[in-house]
């Protein structure tokens, strides 16, 4: 079976706040955007049942299209915002702060305070040459490339296929327009 609403409740609540909708199905969840502008949010990552840190990268891509300023505090892992450099090269307006913008309890003792990314939107994304750095950051680059105007070249996509089963087939089923080198 697929994911359940209960397992993803925090993510689903944020998804709705941004402007998305979803239906719980027997074998998973169907997501869609009902139209209208995306809304900015302020979130902090956390361990389950909080907002999962693995979801912050694709959320940040979506927030580049939200109207206003969003803030994402990363409180679980260090150095999770490196992927934003490529998004800025594609036209995003993301500023990463090495110490948080608010007083949040540390999750891991003796580590620096959490990082925060401030995303100001909406900003049109344009095509660029992007190299996949890691699994989740790279998948976010791929999402941004698909959302961008113009052509992007994404290299090192083998990393993504190791972490997401049949992702190329799934992208095609969603109507993504891309070519693989021969």
Model regions: which residues?
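Short, structured segments at the rim of ligand-binding sites
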Residues: 1-182
